[in-house]
């Protein structure tokens, strides 16, 4: 018997809480399942949004484990599991289950690696990082990289040296990946990013060619100047909205290339940015987001991107990693028993990189 800690909640009115139970590693899995000893797991904003929307009448009274991104070691393998997976394998992946007893933030995960919810499972890459372990970095990329790469590949676009990309929310984890993938995988002409003026240096180091400060500049006006003066009148092939910023929508033709050129506007947050602070929360967040998307999506190519778990993502990530210029950005690594520190920072949108929880 081993102790299995899990970071859980019951519904939106209950705070996160570590619970413990005993599990028998010899009898807790089926013939088609594996058991992963989790070494690290990472928070994403969606984890806390799901917590906040966990209506007690809809989600039931059982504890739900928070988290999706994880890394660890396989410690048990069922008899009918594909020979690709073996005891001792170091792995990382995404456990894409909503309001489930299991989630990434627990000592042991038990699952079928062929399930649609867990197909994003891959051998842990070697990152050769002097500051963080492979386990920490392995837990930092699955959700954000998957979201980003699907935004680049799902809609038939071809990117190259003539392409221009706008990232709304360049300092977010997904924004970071949009910049890196655009510059290093697709070698685009220019990436323009919006961010706080304090983040200019960081985002330019990542690869952003032009930064626009949302705290000191008028974004629509400044964007027009960049298009005219820096991009020689060429508009954007892709606008990737990681921040829920809508001020460009009324005059989208000033910024986005024509629809018949297969230009795309991709949104990953909804049209209204979610506020974790109850005093700032937007009433009707879900409905306003849905109505906003329905209202304008027909006039140009607009997509609200919903990430999918796919086995093919692992090889794509390793290809991206192989160029040697990429490490997932880490804000901090926090022991499980100090999770409240990480939660507070996530809910304030203060993280500059991934908030990783250590299970070592």
Swiss-Prot record:
Family under the similarity heading: Belongs to the YIM1 family.
Cross-referenced Gene3D superfamilies: Medium-chain alcohol dehydrogenases, catalytic domain (3.90.180.10), NAD(P)-binding Rossmann-like Domain (3.40.50.720)
GO CC aspect terms: lipid droplet; mitochondrion
Protein name listed in UniProt: Protein YIM1
Keywords: Lipid droplet, Mitochondrion
Gene designation per UniProt: YIM1
Species of provenance: Kluyveromyces lactis (strain ATCC 8585 / CBS 2359 / DSM 70799 / NBRC 1267 / NRRL Y-1140 / WM37) (Yeast)
Gene Ontology MF term list: oxidoreductase activity
The keyword Mitochondrion is annotated on this UniProt entry: yes
Subcellular location: Lipid droplet; Mitochondrion
Domain of life where this protein originates: Eukaryota
Pfam family, one: ADH_N
Keyword match Mitochondrion: yes
